[in-house]
């Protein structure tokens, strides 16, 4: 018998304000057709004035806890994956910890940009497998609207705000791919490409927040190659084939990246959970947002095999294989 980290509840939160491509076309030199053709995005949610990453994270967390049927006091660990924290410190996770009524255990943030949720899931899984934690709350939450240059049509049209969360609980497994829970996680990074996707600000460099900068074509090329490799790694580690996977929940960066990865790996598009059209790229929040939607509408069912994959600035990339 071995310890597995089982997902027992999912939750998400999207700000109420919707911004369509038509609205952006009135502000910058772009059009609905241009945005849809290059990204597949038609709209995005934007946080209200005064609405912070911790607000989004807390709302998603409370919904995940409700779905799991537990209170915040039962949680031993909170990890928030974010590149847009409320403050330089303390960690956004500590704010969530307080707001959900968790008085023991520990909380911290993970920063791996768009790969952040997969990284955070892997960290929580290892804490559970080590026996230090029984129940963990893993959240991806972002307010990327706060770090966008709204005059730069190459970036401002691509991102949105939101949060998603899952509750993990220790369970017993037999050590096979039939076990429910996280079967494996696979993480990578390559800092030599940091200048292809970055924010030009920070406390120690400019003492400013800065804005997102991206070399889109280069990011696309690396994304398809790296994501295909890390998905293949997850399949090989569990002695599985692409046809064994019930659903793929990819990072929702761009429809073309999702389609390119699916084609390279031989996944039919109807196995790919896609929300990018309505949510845009919500960075670390995108996977748990999409996962929660697919669980909520009944597409993803208990016992099914789900593959999560993401790539972000750094570069960072990773995958997680989960039996729901």
Swiss-Prot record:
GO terms for cellular component: cytoplasm. Pathway: Lipid metabolism; fatty acid biosynthesis. Its main location: cytoplasm. It catalyses: malonyl-[ACP] + acetyl-CoA + H(+) = 3-oxobutanoyl-[ACP] + CO2 + CoA. The keyword Coiled coil does not apply. One of its GO terms (biological process) is fatty acid biosynthetic process. Residues 252-256 are annotated as: ACP-binding. Pfam families: ACP_syn_III, ACP_syn_III_C. It is found in: Cytoplasm. Keywords: Acyltransferase, Cytoplasm, Fatty acid biosynthesis, Fatty acid metabolism, Lipid biosynthesis, Lipid metabolism, Multifunctional enzyme, Transferase. Its EC number is 2.3.1.180. InterPro entries: ACP_syn_III_C, ACP_syn_III_N, FabH, Thiolase-like. The active site is at 114, 251, 281. One of its GO terms (molecular function) is 3-oxoacyl-[acyl-carrier-protein] synthase activity. The last Arg residue of the ACP-binding site is essential for the weak association between ACP/AcpP and FabH. Catalyzes the condensation reaction of fatty acid synthesis by the addition to an acyl acceptor of two carbons from malonyl-ACP. Catalyzes the first condensation reaction which initiates fatty acid synthesis and may therefore play a role in governing the total rate of fatty acid production. Possesses both acetoacetyl-ACP synthase and acetyl transacylase activities. Its substrate specificity determines the biosynthesis of branched-chain and/or straight-chain of fatty acids. Belongs to the thiolase-like superfamily. FabH family. Homodimer. PANTHER family: 3-OXOACYL-[ACYL-CARRIER-PROTEIN] SYNTHASE, BETA-KETOACYL-[ACYL-CARRIER-PROTEIN] SYNTHASE III, CHLOROPLASTIC. This is Beta-ketoacyl-[acyl-carrier-protein] synthase III. It comes from Paramagnetospirillum magneticum (strain ATCC 700264 / AMB-1) (Magnetospirillum magneticum). The gene is fabH.
């Amino acid at each position: 018998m071995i310890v597995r980290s089982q997902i027992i509840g999912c939750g998400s939160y999207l700000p109420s304000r919707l911004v369509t491509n038509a609205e952006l076309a009135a502000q910058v030199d772009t059009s609905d057709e241009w945005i849809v053709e290059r990204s597949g995005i038609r709209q995005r949610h934007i946080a209200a004035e005064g609405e912070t990453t911790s607000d989004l994270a807390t709302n998603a967390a409370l919904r995940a806890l409700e779905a799991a049927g537990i209170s915040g006091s039962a949680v031993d660990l909170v990890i928030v994956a974010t590149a847009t924290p409320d403050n330089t410190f303390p960690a956004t996770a500590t704010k969530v910890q307080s707001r959900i009524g968790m008085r023991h255990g520990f909380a911290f943030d993970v920063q791996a940009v768009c790969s952040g949720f997969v990284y955070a899931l892997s960290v929580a899984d290892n804490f559970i497998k080590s026996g230090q934690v029984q129940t963990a709350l893993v959240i991806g939450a972002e307010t990327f609207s706060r770090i966008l240059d709204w005059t730069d049509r190459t970036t401002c049209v691509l991102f949105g705000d939101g949060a998603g969360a899952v509750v993990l609980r220790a369970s017993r497994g037999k050590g096979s791919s039939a076990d429910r829970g996280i079967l494996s996680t696979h993480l990578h990074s390559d800092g030599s490409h940091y200048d292809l996707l970055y924010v030009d600000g920070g406390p120690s460099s400019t003492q400013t927040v800065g804005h997102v900068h991206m070399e889109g074509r280069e990011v696309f090329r690396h994304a398809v190659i790296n994501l295909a490799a890390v998905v293949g790694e997850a399949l090989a580690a569990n002695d599985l084939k692409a046809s064994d996977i019930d659903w793929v929940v990819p990072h929702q960066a761009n429809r073309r990246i999702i389609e390119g990865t699916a084609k390279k790996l031989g996944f039919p598009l109807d196995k790919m959970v896609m929300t990018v059209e309505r949510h845009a790229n919500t960075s670390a929040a995108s996977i748990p947002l999409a996962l929660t939607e697919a669980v909520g509408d009944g597409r993803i069912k208990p016992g099914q095999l789900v593959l999560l994959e993401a790539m972000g600035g750094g570069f960072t990339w990773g995958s997680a294989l989960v039996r729901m």
